[in-house]
Every structure is written in structure tokens, then in C-alpha cells.
Amino acid sequence: MEHVVTCWRLKLLSWPVFLIWICLSLASVSLISWDQLPAFLIPSTGDSSLQTAKSRDSMKAPGRLLLLTLCILTFSAVCVFLCCWACLPLCLATCLDRHLPAAPRSTVPGPLHFSGYSSVPDGKPLIRELCHSCAVVSNSGQMLGSGLGAQIDGAECVLRMNQAPTVGFEEDVGQRTTLRVISHTSVPLLLRNYSHYFQHARDTLYVVWGQGRHMDRVLGGRTYRTLLQLTRMYPGLQVYTFTERMMAYCDQIFQDETGKNRRQSGSFLSTGWFTMIPALELCEEIVVYGMVSDSYCSEKSPRSVPYHYFEKGRLDECQMYRLHEQAPRSAHRFITEKAVFSRWAKKRPIVFAHPSWRAK
């Protein structure tokens, strides 16, 4: 549902503004033309006082012309202002490289600069080559028993989320990790077993998303200080954060696709959302493993699996999705996000595997 807010404003404003402008213009031309008529063209009624009054009015024509011209100019300025207001979301989205999900990046030899990701601690942008094939591995319990580990590891780049482990699950989820996208709230979970996640993962790129004071670089937010300590503990560790501009871009995409402002609708974007965005930038072809469709949980007998493959016995996946989708505020919109991913799959080479389903 692209440009929903923008289109609504434009439709609301365009026709009334246009009609009012036309009416004012016609009225102005009519009044000015009548005032400028030569005296011999004024209908004679035999009433000299009427003709005298008309003559006096004709002397006021230049003043009326000036007044009407000023009115038209003022109204035109208001029109321009209202149109700019209506187009503001579209302009903002364009400035933030709005068309990323719909159009693939051009493939050029050599590394590319990705300015939406800032390294810790020097703040430099991410520089790397595109991945020809990517495996995006969901944390879903759908992965249990899949036996897809070797296929996942066969992709050029493997993307994982938060603290999802590989040890003990290699047969189903593989063991390679090229990029791990982490929520700022999940950083402490990785620190519980930091040697597993960081000590032997020098080839892994860590990208942390989050907003607010905890991620503040200037003031040294708590999460950012933790990331700094990690880079000191493990020299050469590749840690990046989403820039504020990139975070705003992700919010804007959500609004463009759903017609809802993320904050006003009480929504929190999931790590899955923040994983698909860089995947669209970094990958030429994407296979998403373990992600169900937006209609899966509304089917008669959906398969019951744990929300996370590494947390057995916890809340059922579909129960978690429904709980968040129906919550009035402070919730992830998992089902809504999956509907968006389905639309993206119509424009980009994205395939969903285990369960396998086609974009609608």
C-alpha cells in the first residue's frame, strides 16, 4: 500500500484547490473586463446618474485589478504550501532512497559503500561486496527437523538474527554466519555466552539496531558502551549500528507499506524486519528459511511449533503472532510484516522455504 498517506492528502486537496482557483480566476477576469468596458458599450438606460456612477467605478478599475491580482497570488502561494505539505512524506522517502525494496541495486565489480550502517567505534560506513546468494535463517521452530543445514551453509552469505545459536542445531540451521542482525535489547543475551558468539566469529558481521539513549554515540548510551567494550575485548570484531537515518528509513517503509505510522499505531518493528532491509541491500538473491506466510496462522490446522527453535516448550509460534498482532500498543506486527515481505517477493528474487509458499 505504497504512498497511502501521500495519495490521500493529494486527493483531498487537489480537486477543491483547483476548482476554487479556476472560479477566482474567472471571477477576476469577468470583473476586470466589465470595469474596462468603454463607455459607449455600456447599455444606455436613460439614467445619467447610473452612467455617472459607472464612470466613477471605471476609474477604480486599476485598484481592483491590483487587489484581485494580490488575492490570486496569495491564494496561489497557499496552494503551493498545501501541495508541499501533501508531498512531504513522498519527498522524505525519496531522500532516504525510498525505492530500495522494489528495485535491485546495480551490480558493479568491487566493494560498495552502505551508508546506513556505521562501524563501532570509528563511525565509518559499511564497505563490502554484494552477495550473489543469501540465506536468511528465521528463529522459528519451523526449522526443527528441516535438515536444511547443508543447504543453508551452501549460500554465499548466511544471515541470522539476535542470539539464535548454531551449536547443537547444525543439521537444521547450518553453522556459518556471515551477518548477524541484533536488537539492542538482545545484546545482553549474547553477552551471556560471548565466547560462543564473538571469540570464534571473526568473519561475522554484527549489525545492531535500536534507537534512543541506549544507542547514543555522542552521550555514550549503555548499549553502545557495551559494543565498545566488545571491540576492545576482541580486536578485529566487525560491529556496526544502524544509523539514525536508516532507522527513520525503516519506519518510513513501514508507513508506506501499511498506511500506518509506526509510533502512532503502537508498533515495534521486529528484528526480522531489520534483517530483511539489509538483505535487500546486500543480496542479489534471497532464500528465507522458516518464515511462514501472513495467512499461515489463520489456516484450519497450522503446525504447532515453538516461537524460537532454541526455546522448546515456550509459547507456540502462532499464539505469539496473534498476541502481538492484536495488542493495542507496544507490540510487534509479525503477520503484517510477513504480508509486506510477500509483496516484496513479487518485485525482488525472494524465495520462502520450509514452509515453502508463494508470494500473493
UniProtKB/Swiss-Prot annotation:
Topology feature Cytoplasmic, residues: 1-71
Stretches that traverse the bilayer:
72-94
Which stretches are Lumenal in the membrane topology?
95-360
Which source organism? Mus musculus
- Pathway(s) per entry: Protein modification; protein glycosylation; Glycolipid biosynthesis
Q: Where in the cell is it found?
A: Golgi apparatus membrane
Major subcellular site: Golgi
Any single Pfam family the record assigns to this protein = Glyco_transf_29
Q: Which family does it belong to?
A: Belongs to the glycosyltransferase 29 family.
Q: Which GO terms describe its cellular component?
A: Golgi membrane
Q: Where is the signal peptide?
A: none
Which PANTHER family does the record match to this protein? ALPHA-N-ACETYL-NEURAMINYL-2,3-BETA-GALACTOSYL-1, 3-N-ACETYL-GALACTOSAMINIDE ALPHA-2,6-SIALYLTRANSFERASE-LIKE (PTHR45906), ALPHA-N-ACETYL-NEURAMINYL-2,3-BETA-GALACTOSYL-1,3-N-ACETYL-GALACTOSAMINIDE ALPHA-2,6-SIALYLTRANSFERASE (PTHR45906:SF4)
Protein's name according to its UniProt entry: Alpha-N-acetyl-neuraminyl-2,3-beta-galactosyl-1,3-N-acetyl-galactosaminide alpha-2,6-sialyltransferase
Query: Looking at the keywords, is Transmembrane present?
Result: yes
Q: What's its catalytic activity?
A: an alpha-Neu5Ac-(2->3)-beta-D-Gal-(1->3)-D-GlcNAc derivative + CMP-N-acetyl-beta-neuraminate = an alpha-Neu5Ac-(2->3)-beta-D-Gal-(1->3)-[alpha-Neu5Ac-(2->6)]-D-GlcNAc derivative + CMP + H(+); N-acetyl-alpha-neuraminosyl-(2->3)-beta-D-galactosyl-(1->3)-N-acetyl-D-galactosamine + CMP-N-acetyl-beta-neuraminate = N-acetyl-alpha-neuraminosyl-(2->3)-beta-D-galactosyl-(1->3)-[N-acetyl-alpha-neuraminosyl-(2->6)]-N-acetyl-D-galactosamine + CMP + H(+); a ganglioside GM1b (d18:1(4E)) + CMP-N-acetyl-beta-neuraminate = a ganglioside GD1alpha (d18:1(4E)) + CMP + H(+); 3-O-[alpha-Neu5Ac-(2->3)-beta-D-Gal-(1->3)-alpha-D-GalNAc]-L-Ser-[protein] + CMP-N-acetyl-beta-neuraminate = a 3-O-{alpha-Neu5Ac-(2->3)-beta-D-Gal-(1->3)-[alpha-Neu5Ac-(2->6)]-alpha-D-GalNAc}-L-seryl-[protein] + CMP + H(+)
Membrane association type: Single-pass type II membrane protein
- Report the protein's function: Transfers the sialyl group (N-acetyl-alpha-neuraminyl or NeuAc) from CMP-NeuAc to the GalNAc residue on the NeuAc-alpha-2,3-Gal-beta-1,3-GalNAc sequence of glycoproteins and glycolipids forming an alpha-2,6-linkage. Produces branched type disialyl structures by transfer of a sialyl group onto a GalNAc residue inside the backbone core chains. Prefers O-glycans to glycoproteins or glycolipids.
Sites where a glycan is attached = N193
GO BP term (any one): protein glycosylation
EC id: 2.4.3.7
A Gene Ontology molecular function term for this protein is: alpha-N-acetylneuraminyl-2,3-beta-galactosyl-1,3-N-acetyl-galactosaminide 6-alpha-sialyltransferase activity
Per UniProt, what is the name of the gene that codes for the protein in this document? St6galnac4
* Alphabetical keyword list: Disulfide bond, Glycoprotein, Glycosyltransferase, Golgi apparatus, Lipid metabolism, Membrane, Sialic acid, Signal-anchor, Transferase, Transmembrane, Transmembrane helix
Cystine pairings recorded for this chain: C134-C283
Q: What is the tissue specificity?
A: High expression in brain and colon and to a lesser extent in lung, heart, kidney, spleen and thymus.
Instruction: Decide whether keyword Transferase is in the record.
Output: yes
